[in-house]
Swiss-Prot record:
InterPro entries: Chromo-like_dom_sf (IPR016197), MRG (IPR008676), MRG_C_sf (IPR038217), MRG_dom (IPR026541), MSL3_chromo-like (IPR053820). It comes from the Eukaryota. It comes from Caenorhabditis elegans. Pfam families: MRG, MSL3_chromo-like. This is Mortality factor related protein 1. The lineage of its organism: Eukaryota, Metazoa, Ecdysozoa, Nematoda, Chromadorea. The gene is mrg-1. Protein involved in the remodeling of chromatin thereby regulating various processes including transcription, chromosome synapsis and genome integrity. Mainly binds genomic loci carrying trimethylated histone H3 'Lys-36' (H3K36me3) or 'Lys-4' (H3K4me3), and acetylated histone H3 'Lys-9' (H3K9ac), 'Lys-27' (H3K27ac). During meiosis, required for the presynaptic pairing of homologous chromosomal regions outside of the pairing center and for the progression of chromosome synapsis. Essential maternal factor required in postembryonic germline development and in maintaining germ cell identity.
Length: 337
């Protein structure tokens, strides 16, 4: 028997997200595999990656009749800062306003469509707040490594594949993709305008940063994982016919960690990214763009982590020989030891 529905498909509503009202729309009412009816809620002006499914009958504190402004006035609630004049704040605190189209690849204008205008943050403001499911991945990862399990590499879903999947969700035309390396930031007084192309550029930049960080002095690797990394570099070099006894040739072999490692190691980098960025000479506008892109990517990872992470199935026990070699590994400087 169907539950009584207080809202209809196509109805404009106010939906509460992280304690604040946003204008939204009921786009559909679906039934899941358990026979539970769900409201499909789309936040107006946001990419569909933010869509939510709220069980019918459990929407009491989430969905309300009317607009966000009407809800705020009636309940004496604060409107989200994205609906007001931008203020200086941590961009990881709440989901950014997203003006992208819902269908990828439909943008036809010559100018990249703007995603959001956000206040400029300084290096001291930087913060990456991983959602609980992503934090749990890192906690479980630490526990498994401490029990002498190692992440299986190459991973089924590499960082390169994850970022490729993410980029596919960002609506840009083929013409715009060909200009992805052009100027992507527009300054408006104290604010910064972020385009869809800027999100793509930032995501690709994070991959490059990941490759440098993981491959430099064993950053992002626990000491127990270092022999695995060295073995993998040598294996890939031998496959290319490179002399592995030549340190210079091995270093220039073109090994890309992003082709081998998956979401766990990428999350390790994101969690420490503010500390890394403070060591750079980039100005506040560049840092601001990066952090907005990071947050948008985290939303994607949180929504899709079940595809890219399988828990303990992504790990394997180490052999006795491997364990002995890990104890003899050099003490390099690493973010995780």
């Amino acid at each position: 028997m169907s539950s009584k529905k207080n809202f209809e498909v196509g109805e404009n509503v106010a939906c509460i997200y992280k304690g604040k009202p946003y204008d939204a729309k009921i786009t559909d009412i679906k039934t899941n595999s358990d026979g539970k009816e769900l409201y499909c809620v789309h936040f107006k002006g946001w990419n569909n990656r933010y869509d939510e499914k709220i069980p019918v009958g459990e929407e009491k504190d989430r969905i309300f009749k009317g607009t966000a402004s009407e809800y705020a006035e009636k309940h004496n609630a604060e409107l989200p800062t994205t609906a007001l004049k931008p203020k200086k704040k941590s961009l990881a605190a709440e989901a950014p306003r997203d003006d992208r189209d819902d269908t990828p690849g439909t943008s036809k204008g010559k100018k990249a469509k703007s995603v959001t205008i956000a206040p400029v943050m300084t290096a001291d403001d930087m913060k990456v707040e991983l959602p609980k499911p992503l934090r749990k991945i890192l906690i479980d990862d630490y526990d498994l490594v401490c029990r002498y399990f190692i992440n299986i590499v190459p991973h089924e879903y590499s960082v390169d594949q994850i970022i490729e999947d993410y980029i596919k969700t960002i609506p840009v035309s083929n013409e715009q993709m060909r200009t992805v390396d052009d100027l992507l930031i527009e300054y408006e007084e104290a604010d910064i305008k972020i385009t869809n192309l800027a999100l793509i550029c930032t995501a690709r930049g994070l991959v490059d940063y990941f490759n440098v960080t993981l491959g430099s002095s064993y950053q992002l690797l626990y000491k127990f994982e270092r022999p695995q990394y060295n073995d993998l570099v040598k294996k890939r070099a031998m496959e290319k016919g490179i002399d592995i006894t030549n340190p210079t040739a091995l270093q220039d072999s073109g090994f890309r960690p992003s082709q081998e490692y998956g979401i766990v190691h990428f999350l390790r980098m994101l969690a420490k990214l503010p500390d890394y960025l403070k060591l750079t000479q980039w100005n506040d506008h560049v840092i601001n763009r990066i952090m907005i892109g990071v947050h948008d990517l985290i939303v994607f990872l949180n929504k899709n982590h079940g595809k890219y992470y399988r828990g303990s199935s992504d790990y394997q026990g180490a052999s006795n020989d491997y364990y002995r070699r890990s104890l003899a590994a050099d003490d390099g400087v690493g973010a995780n030891q």
